[in-house]
Amino acid sequence: MAEHPPLLDTAQILSSDISLLSAPIVSADGTQQVILVQVNPGEAFTIRREDGQFQCITGPAQVPMMSPNGSVPPIYVPPGYAPQVIEDNGVRRVVVVPQSPEFHPGGHTVIHRSPHPPLPGFIPVPTMMPPPPRHMYSPVTGAGDMATQYMPQYQSSQVYADVDAHSTHGRSNFRDERSSKTYERLQKKLKDRQGTQKDKMSSPPPSPQKCPSPISEHNGLIKGQNASGGNTGSARNRSGRGRSCTQVDPEMEEKDEETKAFEAFLSNIVKPVASDIQARTVLLTWSPPSSFINGEVNETAVPELFNYEVLVSSTGKEGKYRSVYIGEETSVTLNDLKPATDYHAKVQAESNSIKGIPSEAESFTTLSCEPDPPNAPRIANRTKNSLTLQWKAPSDNGSKIQSFILEWDEGKGNGEFCQCYMGSQKQFKITKLSPAMGCKFRLSAKNDYGVSDFSEEVLYYTSGCAPSVPASPVLTKAGVTWLSLQWTKPSGTPSDEGISYILEMEEETSGYGFKPKYDGEDLAYTVKNLRRSTKYKFKVIAYNSEGKSNPSEVVEFSTCPDKPGVPVKPSVKGKIHSHGFKITWDPPKDNGGAPINKYVVEMAEGSNGNKWDMIYSGTTREHLCDRLTPGCYYRLRVYCISDGGQSAVSESLLVQTPAVPPGPCLPPRLQGRPKAKEIQLRWGPPQVDGGSPISCYAVEMTPADKDEPRDVYQGSEVECTVGSLLPGKTYSFRLRAANRIGFGPFSEKYDITTAPGPPDQCRPPQVTCRSATCAQVNWEIPLSNGTDVTEYRLEWGGVEGSMQMCYCGPGLSCELKGLSPATTYYCRVQAMSVVGAGPFSEVVACVTPPSVPAIVTCLQEISDDDIEYPHYSPSTCLAISWKEPYDHGSEILAYSIDLGDKQPLTVGKMTSYIIDSLQPDTTYRIRIQALNSLGAGPFSHTIKLKTKPLPPDPPRLECVAFNHQNLKLKWGEGTPKTLSTDAVQYHLQMEDRNGRFVSLYRGPCHTYKVQRLSESTSYKFCIQACNEAGEGPLSQEYVFTTPKSLPAALKAPKIEKINDHICEITWEYLQPMKGDPVIYNLQVMVGKDSEFKQIYKGPDTSFRYSSLQLNCEYRFRVCAIRQCQDPTGHQDLVGPYSTTVFFISQRTEPPASSNKDSVDSARTRRTLSDEQCAAVILVVFAFFSILIAFIIQYFVIK
């Protein structure tokens, strides 16, 4: 409410949303001072004059006030604020600032707030203080005495990036060093006075009130004595730190610390800055959330991009906010705002579906502008000579509407308008008009910012006389029970004049005259519920507010007739003939109000036929149906046609014509070529079946030299074979068909001549066996049937049903050679002529005499796996098998095996034999022949077989490497790289707990590692060698014993410094190993020594080393020793040493530097952690696994 002080930044004051009071003290002489109260534009200051009346002074203005005692009087401020006296270049100013730790530099804005109440330090405050003045404009109503309360608007240049250069009245503000220090002291006092800590950067300062007071709103602006207090209360409720109105959100308590920290980071966002404020647009900019919270750096991971949501409210800071923007940009231009309206904007940050608390609200007010376009004026009253128009005021957009401008076209209708009224009234009466005169009007509003756009154009008419006689109604469409009528306006009637019409109707037979059927403003009407085919008279009367017109001329229209009813089902008149019949029918019972014009008869063929053909159309009610097919079904129906339309079809009549015998068939035809004794005939059905299906055919044959016909076929088939004919004879055939009525006429005759016949069947041939492999066949000449025999065919075979032709020629005998002894053969003979081949003779069987056996086949070696002979040795034996040959009629008695140089072997009747007593690794040529009582058969094919060498002896087995779990065995003199294709294979076996030897390894390698054994345990092994000759003998039993296991490697020892010369080394404890005690050996290497020295050996797990030297480097390591008690005596098993630990002795510093000593001590105790040791072991294990896999791949598989 006063001038912005130079000490406190204007942007800081404005961001707190309070009204300011700055009272510059003009004279500081200590007696009487004049205090100037600066009232900012848009604000008001209430004082009480000497006469006791209250006066409201609106800004911009300076109000001089006198201080009688020379001191600065107390300034009344609302709750949550405090007055501060600041001296600037000899001028003291009273500044109202908020009591909040949140009073910090922020965004820039312009605030128009409600004025403060009167200052009690200057004027007495009565009991009944009038309420402070309301806001000086309202964009909603736009009416009233707004001119006296108009508030000048700020321009967009009021928002600056440099706060020090901001001044409301254009005066430059300055800040010297003294004022800066004063400002810092003021900020510190405000924070100390507040006494509370803020939860988040976005939370407003706490309020001394328990609950926020109700906030009223007018035109989107907050009013009340302390709008900031309401905002504070709401923010405290959100953060859960209010006193009596506190609400705790249970979901916030369940969130983890990381989510809470990230929400706090997102909530640390500064309120947006409003710039470039126009009447309907504003530019909002903001910055991403800051990583500094309460002066500390937030270690929460900051994402690269944020999503921002801009919330805007026009109903006050505590009003309802709506989202106007969601995106990743840090600036947005808001459009479609209301002019001269207070808005409050917040921004809310979001990332990974986590939202922060919205920022503080940035308040701004849009600029005023010209009014909105008003609505078109409405007609309030009209007469024949005047029109009275009314209208409503539009939104004034922040400036009171000064006048309205009403224009009209003077009734000319040429589109040119002139002003007929300008003033502040909201109605106007235009006089001196003509009756039924049409005028166009438009309206605009004007304020201090200009003239609005014109409203829509409207056309209004003055009142006129009663309507003239309208034209007669016209029939547009007629139906059976309705008539659609249409009429026009009377001539010369204005288009906007409200005219109603009365439609009257008269029915000829009613006798009641005309009756109204319609009364309204429409120009068309459909009269319903009329009778069909009836005439009606109509007339129309027009009327308005001035009276009724004369009725129009009477017109007459008729409704349409209805379609007739369904005719009666047609019936047959007289007898039904095979080719026609007569039908008749009766007219429908209802003709639809019009005479029947014609009847239509339709007919469909078949009992279920749907293809209807029209066969009659006329006025008579009977019809002769002719040219029909006998024995066929016909369906007939009838319908009638009148002026009202076509009726539905009647029920169908089903009629069947009587059947007749079928018509003549076409002569039968020869199918294929005629044969000597039979012919094949085929025919088709007759063209006319007589109305009944063909059930039978009859074929009649007559020889050419005889006149005695006879039936050769009767049946339903369309083909037949006529046999028992003579070759070269002529025969006549004719055909007839029959149905259920009877046979039809014969067809024409068809002559066919048979072909010449082949020779007759020969008599059975005679077979004479000359030897076991040769036979003679003889036959006789058969009857030739009129043609000479040209050749004979002899078929011969060992199976009766599968004989092959072995001779073809004119001879009467044939000699067959190459026959099998003691075999049954079959033969037959056939004679042929130029006509064809005669039938074969009967089959004759003969048997050839016996002979020596046939050749032996399938001679082969028997596999070793298939031999079950216990004394078989592949080195001295050969096993052969063969297939038994044909014995040729004499039983096989024995077989002779030829081995080449050796004497042939004679064996009994068998098909396999093992030849023994052979030389190892020797090749033999073997063949075999069969023997019977008639002699020896031919030798079989020769095969070459070779005996295998003798199996090898077992190698010597020895143990080349061992530990407590593994034994590496070696045998033979093989090279390390042994191929899997080596001839010699080795089979290693080990004795199990049950005393049985189990297989460990079978392959060509000469070494094998036995794993997962028990320590200090004896195991028995044996081995045998194998090659293609077989498995060699087992070796003797070898006994190998595993040693005891060594202790495991210890972790790196821990070193703790006792003083400058003593340190304590500790290490982990190992459990006794299977009853054997464990002791420890501690070694140290001092300085640049190259060897470790033992400093302790015993069962303890710690040792104090007291020979430390200052600034000297020590290396410690420790190992475990297992003390074994064997029957042979005492034995120590030393385990691997632990990781070496480095230690540097340094002088102990005073206690003040205890932190540094702890750091140095920590540095001297750098050892590998358990995780690092596990990682190293895992890497080593992986390396050795890969190496072993490579060795197996290279030496074993390849």
UniProtKB/Swiss-Prot annotation:
Membrane-topology descriptor: Single-pass membrane protein
SUPFAM superfamilies: Fibronectin type III (SSF49265)
GO terms for biological process, alphabetical: cell-cell adhesion; fertilization; Sertoli cell development; spermatid development
GO CC terms in record: acrosomal vesicle; cytoplasmic vesicle; cytosol; Golgi membrane; vesicle membrane
Region: Disordered, residue numbers: 188-257
Xref: CDD domains: FN3 (cd00063)
Intrachain S-S bonds: none
Record-listed N6-acetyllysine modification sites: K384
Record's subcellular location: Golgi apparatus membrane
Biased composition (Basic and acidic residues): 188-201
Pfam families on file: fn3
Tissue-by-tissue expression: Testis. Localizes to the acrosome of spermatids, as well as to Leydig cells. Can be detected on the acrosome beginning at steps 2-3 and continuing until step 12 of spermiogenesis.
Annotated transmembrane regions: 1177-1197
Residue numbers bearing the Phosphoserine modification: S203, S207, S213
Every Fibronectin type-III domain range: 268-369, 373-465, 469-562, 566-660, 664-757, 761-851, 863-950, 951-1045, 1049-1151
InterPro entries named among the record's database cross-references: E3_ligase_FN3/SPRY, FN3_dom, FN3_sf, Ig-like_fold
Protein function: Mediates spermatid-Sertoli adhesion during spermatogenesis.
PANTHER family: E3 UBIQUITIN-PROTEIN LIGASE TRIM36-RELATED (PTHR24099), FIBRONECTIN TYPE III DOMAIN-CONTAINING 3BA-RELATED (PTHR24099:SF11)
Family, similarity comment: Belongs to the FNDC3 family.
Protein name stated in the entry: Fibronectin type-III domain-containing protein 3A
Organism annotation: Mus musculus
